[in-house]
């Protein structure tokens, strides 16, 4: 038995519990009965880090020199190619072959013009059918520059064949882009078929309180038509009011607005509503679904997406802005048609180019003028053609088509339909009113009662305008049968005058104390603000802006009151005429 003091004793080298430490490397095998000598492996060869860095620097320097030599050789080779005439001719031939190949591919794929797909066209036609079904009166909007080109006879035939005895009215929009004499001729031509109303939509970009001018279209001057205010709304509302009165409508009517893309359907609705109720733009296809807009408690407007008629020429479809300009595969051909139809002198003056003989020369000059280039520094005729088409559809290039010399009634219309439409809308009364105003037309320019002016001056013009005679007559319980001369009460302000200069307004005797508040000189207001303490100028400016907003609201209230007074006066005159006739 082991003693306790020997129990934890470490075993010695010769004891039984001692293990011999083995050599970490394997023992060499015996060769020919003799034990081989063991070789201890030596440490690897040590390489200094600077040797690797120097080697890499040498390789990089050699690579940079090789690349520099290759670039110099490529530049010299390119320089030699440019110097030779043969290489230039070969480059021209290569580009011509590429262009011809591109034309062949376009013709094979039938990519001109790129209209909407079949599903989209069916969806638009479905929305059009819904508008026709729900409407009592259909307003077909036409472009005054080309009314017959924008007129869709298939659409009119579908409206006349629909159930419910639908009524159809033509609206000649964009009359500010056509001379006044041409507009009158088109009105006389179209009124032989259907009731026609001249109209100009508002071109303002604000959301509310769109301006509307009460001056009749026949009486408005050229400068007045070029303003941003709306024209023809009163006449159109009178036509719809005649339908409600003669048709004995007890509740309300729905008025559908249809037509080709980009003829101004949504702009017409916004002008009647005097607010931005529908999205508008110079690109076709913005309106995709039927939209209902409440005009008042008697009239509801239905906006429909534009429809492109089936049998139509490709170039004509593009020139009527029925296709996106940026999606055209070949915009050069429509530009060639424009140069054939329009006055070349006006186009040359507009773009500042002259002396061109072909369409290619014209587009190259326009590309040089506008800076339209492509890769290689060459002028892009495609981009120049798209820019010309964009100016065409936006109305910057003036053009119009005169009405035909002889009138022929379309096949889908008959004498009975024309007579019925005339009696329902009482067009003869409207034409007689226009003739009376033409007789009272003075030699001077018309007044811009609700044009694009400052709110202070707008209120001054409203208070001085002859429309106050109607309001005074209604207050005195008298009947007004005819609106007198609307000219000569205030001068036409220069809307392009810069700064805070005074407007030349003919101040007549004022019966309202509001005029003294509105006729404050704006220069004196600024002068008072500048004379105040610099620490209080911000507060003074905020107070001036607050007063300006107050004047704007006051002018809007007066405008609405005067418009209501005018409509009630016209109703009184119509009832008086009926009583005299009885």
Swiss-Prot record:
Sequence position, cross-link Glycyl lysine isopeptide (Lys-Gly) (interchain with G-Cter in SUMO1): 477
InterPro entries: G_CP_dom, GTP-bd, GTP-bd_ortho_bundle_sf, P-loop_NTPase, TRAFAC_YlqF/YawG_RiboMat
Subcellular location: Nucleus, Nucleolus
A GO CC annotation given for this chain: telomerase holoenzyme complex
Chain residue ranges for the region called Disordered: 1-58
Domain CP-type G, chain residue ranges per copy: 125-310
Region (Required for nucleolar localization): 9-35
First-listed, main subcellular location of the protein, grouped into a coarse class: nucleus
Biological-process GO terms, alphabetical: negative regulation of protein binding; negative regulation of protein sumoylation; negative regulation of protein ubiquitination; negative regulation of telomere maintenance via telomerase; positive regulation of protein localization to chromosome, telomeric region; positive regulation of protein-containing complex assembly; regulation of protein stability; ribosome biogenesis
UniProt keyword annotations, A-Z: Coiled coil, GTP-binding, Isopeptide bond, Nucleotide-binding, Nucleus, Ribosome biogenesis, Ubl conjugation
UniProt KW Transmembrane helix keyword: no
Record Gene3D superfamilies: 1.10.1580.10, P-loop containing nucleotide triphosphate hydrolases
Any Pfam family hit: MMR_HSR1
Biased composition (Basic and acidic residues): 48-58
Residues bound to GTP: 173-176, 259-266, 303-306
SUPFAM superfamilies, sorted: P-loop containing nucleoside triphosphate hydrolases
Coiled-coil stretches: 58-88
Top-level taxon of the source organism: Eukaryota
PANTHER family in UniProt: GTP-BINDING PROTEIN-RELATED, GUANINE NUCLEOTIDE-BINDING PROTEIN-LIKE 3-LIKE PROTEIN
Similarity remark: Belongs to the TRAFAC class YlqF/YawG GTPase family.
Function: Stabilizes TERF1 telomeric association by preventing TERF1 recruitment by PML. Stabilizes TERF1 protein by preventing its ubiquitination and hence proteasomal degradation. Does so by interfering with TERF1-binding to FBXO4 E3 ubiquitin-protein ligase. Required for cell proliferation. By stabilizing TRF1 protein during mitosis, promotes metaphase-to-anaphase transition. Stabilizes MDM2 protein by preventing its ubiquitination, and hence proteasomal degradation. By acting on MDM2, may affect TP53 activity. Required for normal processing of ribosomal pre-rRNA. Binds GTP.
Domain notes: In contrast to other GTP-binding proteins, this family is characterized by a circular permutation of the GTPase motifs described by a G4-G1-G3 pattern.
Subunit structure: Interacts with MDM2; this interaction, which occurs in the nucleoplasm, stabilizes MDM2. Indirectly interacts with TP53, via MDM2-binding. Interacts with TERF1; this interaction probably occurs in the nucleoplasm and is increased during mitosis, when the nucleolus is disassembled. This binding may promote TERF1 homodimerization. Interacts with TERT.
Protein name: Guanine nucleotide-binding protein-like 3-like protein
